[in-house]
From Swiss-Prot:
Gene transcribed to yield this protein: pdsA
Signal peptide: none
Known EC number: 5.4.99.32
Species per Swiss-Prot/TrEMBL record: Neosartorya fischeri (strain ATCC 1020 / DSM 3700 / CBS 544.65 / FGSC A1164 / JCM 1740 / NRRL 181 / WB 181) (Aspergillus fischerianus)
Family: Belongs to the terpene cyclase/mutase family.
Catalytic-site annotation from UniProt: 463
Enzyme type, top EC level: isomerase
Purpose: Protostadienol synthase which cyclizes (3S)-oxidosqualene to (17Z)-protosta-17(20),24-dien-3-beta-ol (protostadienol), the biosynthetic precursor of helvolic acid, a secondary metabolite which promotes virulence.
Protein name: Protostadienol synthase A
GO biological process: ergosterol biosynthetic process; triterpenoid biosynthetic process
């Protein structure tokens, strides 16, 4: 490392973040917030008194996520990859929580928090004043210049984003004459007013009592009565679409709406550009603003909407009653299986309203969900918002452990206490049983799985299970680590992974693809694409290949033929799914660089690389083609929508660069200089604290929506640097750092 006798003993890290003018009037004393954790669960708490705050000083972790300054020992500037790893790890290990995991926000979609706030308002559960302030601050920090909000942060204003967050801010106490509300209202009316919101927005306005059910595309619950073998049964749909639809159909079937009150009456006046009583509601069913609609409706979708409307006119009462009872059973079982969390906050909110309608506010259902409201909430630099899930606890922890193994950190005695704690968390997070009513409620078996977030959330995910198995096998091989997770439990996980394979090879996320692709023709979300069924993903498939081959080396006799056949089919899928441009397309990260990183690692497990595989040659050529002059890579989120590599307008990004370097190293790319330049870019972007600063949105959820995965800039970068040193030696890169 470069040393300097004049180097300060400490360095101050800071967020380099400031509130917008509108947000600056809101917020709380950030020095009073503390993060409580429990087996991956996150609960931000505001300490009311100065005495409490003194007794429990803020940690570096809390200060970092809140955007407060923090003081750390100064680190010499790295000139070698492993020195950068050392500096990065010295910082990142401080973000481990008390229960052993690495957690963070995965916010981005701008309708999740608003749905939860609307649901809580309707049920009559007040929100703590400090949470209200921070929710307001978040929205006013991510507001667009025109005063509106989009589908996700950093996206153009839409009716859906604007009307949902307008209603949320009014519920939280902002008056209609507040400058932020006036600007939002002007944008809303310019885009077509609330009547032009998509179906999801119409639903939320209906339950709030500020839109009429006659203006909705019908959402009948009767598909639940269709034989499970037919594609129109929700059991054949993507798991998130299924969960949202079931609760929406229950509330639609009952025409549930909040009784009018003073705020509801005011919103009826504020949200529309004509008097509420004069709106022709049936004419609004397919009225969706051009700013919201992803594609124009097809004649099939128009015909489907007409058929639903006709059916609703002539519905059979006893079938409707049966369907509503079945919907309620599905909602109750989902809530019970997930310990009141539900699969994600979007369906949590609509499920809460359904259970409130069925059982009342004093039921154990609502009490249990009230206590879980905090779980997906994360207090980040902009304020408080719901994440897309109840966190990323298991996923980020597994990737972090992998990074320490790759960089040789895990074998060092000074790191083993930290990583034993991480292993303990992974141990505690494995799901040990199948869900109640597994087949009736369309669930994939979960015994032996690892979840994306927490065991309580209880959903099996193919790649999180795969990554967990891989790091458990590797970590438990290292001297000094206990064998916390038995051979039997690892074998259960392998059984589960093998059971999730799709016919013909390849892996989805939550469950094998169940429905035919033509269901996408009936997609009435207007907002998203490819959300009617699950899909095959190169990133999930590659994680499975890496996991199975790692497991097979340690346990060569367990289901050897099944594993070999699955890996072979998975490799065939990767070769089939490569794009003509040479890359692979991701659905969970941005985008070609992300999936290509995974695919090249998966192919490398079977000995395929640039020297012997045409697919790897094309992939290396693709990545090298898009390297920027500064040595980095930067890919725009717009790639997800347009299906072609688009450079990021702000230039190179740490995450995309790490992905590309990992992929090129996995493929044994012969262009050492290009890889060296990528590594040098990562080292130049490292701060004096050892951290890397936030950049562009890292993740994708339901294309084209973007979301944050802020830990990606740490563990993938540490992986890239560690693997570079392992492959090319820990050479001095001082000349490249000038």
């Amino acid at each position: 490392m470069t040393t300097d006798s004049s180097m300060p003993a400490t360095v101050i890290g800071k967020a380099e973040f400031s509130n917008t003018k509108a947000a600056s009037e809101f917020g709380t004393n950030l020095s009073r917030w503390r993060l409580n954790v429990d087996n991956g669960r996150h609960m931000w708490e505001y300490l009311e008194s100065e005495d409490e705050a003194r007794k429990r000083p803020q940690s570096i972790l809390e200060k970092y996520w809140l955007g407060l300054p923090y003081e750390l020992p100064a680190r010499p500037r790295a000139t070698r990859a492993l020195e950068a790893v050392e500096n990065g790890w010295e910082f990142f290990k401080r973000l481990q929580t008390a229960d052993g995991h690495w957690g963070c926000n995965d916010d981005g979609p701008l309708f999740v928090t608003s749905g939860m706030v609307i649901a809580r308002y309707i049920v009559g559960i007040p929100i703590d004043s400090h949470m209200k302030q921070e929710m307001c601050r978040y929205l006013l920090n991510v507001v667009n210049e025109d005063g509106g909000w989009g589908l996700f942060i950093q996206s153009p204003s839409t009716v859906f984003g604007t009307v949902m967050n307008y209603c949320m801010l009014r519920i939280l106490g902002l008056g209609p004459e507040h400058p932020a509300m006036a600007r939002a209202r002007n944008t809303l009316h310019r885009l077509g007013s609330a009547s032009a919101t998509p179906t999801w927005g119409k639903f939320w306005l209906c339950v709030l009592g500020v839109y009429e059910w006659e203006g909705m595309i019908p959402l009948p619950p009767e598909p639940l009565l269709v034989p499970a073998s037919l594609p129109f049964n929700p059991g054949k749909w993507w798991v998130h679409t299924r969960n949202v639809y079931i609760s929406m159909s229950y509330l639609y079937g009952h025409r549930f709406s909040m009784p009018p009150n003073k705020l509801v009456q005011a919103l009826r006046d504020e949200l529309y550009d004509i008097p509420y009583e004069q709106i022709n509601w049936p004419a609004q069913r397919t009225n969706v603003s051009a700013a919201d609609r992803l594609t124009d409706p097809t004649w099939i979708q128009r015909s489907f909407t007409s058929a639903l409307t006709t059916y609703e006119t002539f519905k059979i009462p006893f079938l409707r009653r049966r369907a509503l009872n079945e919907a309620l059973f599905q909602i109750e079982t989902e809530t019970r299986n997930t310990h009141y969390l539900c699969i994600a906050p979007v369906s949590f909110a609509s499920n809460m309203l359904a259970l409130y309608h069925a059982h009342g506010r004093d039921s154990h259902w609502i009490r249990g969900m009230r206590d879980r409201f905090i779980d997906p909430m994360w207090l980040c630099r902009e304020g408080l918002a719901a994440s897309g899930t109840n966190g990323t606890s298991l996923w980020d922890t597994a990737l972090t452990v992998q990074a320490t193994i790759d960089a040789g950190l895990a074998a060092r005695p000074e790191n083993q206490a930290i990583l034993r704690k991480a292993l303990e968390f992974i141990d505690n997070s494995q799901i040990r049983e199948d869900p109640l009513g597994v087949h009736h409620v369309y669930r994939q078996p979960t015994r032996g799985a690892w979840p994306f977030s927490t065991r309580d959330q209880s959903y099996a995910v193919s790649d999180t299970t795969a990554e967990a198995v891989k790091v458990v096998v590797l970590l438990q091989q290292i001297e000094g680590f206990p064998s916390r997770i038995s051979d039997e439990r690892l074998q259960q996980a392998i059984d589960l992974i093998l059971g999730m394979e799709n016919a013909g090879g390849g892996f989805s996320a939550y469950e094998p693809v169940r429905g035919p692709k033509f269901l996408e023709l009936l997609n009435i979300t207007e907002l998203y694409e490819n959300v009617m069924t699950d899909n095959l993903y190169p990133e999930c498939t590659s994680s499975v290949i890496m996991s199975l081959t790692t497991f097979a080396r340690e346990y060569p006799t367990y289901r050897a033929r099944d594993i070999q056949a699955c890996v072979s089919r998975s490799v065939d899928y990767l070769l089939r799914s490569q794009y003509p441009n040479g890359g692979w397309f991701a659905s969970w990260g941005v985008c070609f660089t992300y999936a290509t990183m995974f695919a090249l690692q998966g192919l490398a497990c079977m000995g395929r690389n640039e020297s012997n595989c045409a697919a790897c040659q094309r992939a290396c050529s693709f990545l090298l083609q898009h390297q920027n002059p500064d040595g980095g890579w930067g890919e725009s989120l717009d790639t997800v929508r347009f299906k072609q590599y688009l450079p990021h307008p702000d230039g190179s990004q740490v995450t995309n660069t790490a992905y590309a370097v990992i992929g090129l190293l996995a493929a044994r790319c012969g262009n050492h200089e290009a890889i060296r330049r990528g590594v040098a870019y990562l080292m130049k972007e490292q701060q004096d604290t050892g951290e890397w600063l936030p950049g562009a949105l890292e993740g994708v959820f339901a294309p084209p929506g973007g979301m944050r995965y802020p830990n990606y800039k740490f563990h993938f970068t540490l992986m890239a640097l560690g693997r570079y040193a392992a492959v090319h030696g820990d050479e001095c890169l001082a000349a490249q750092l000038v």
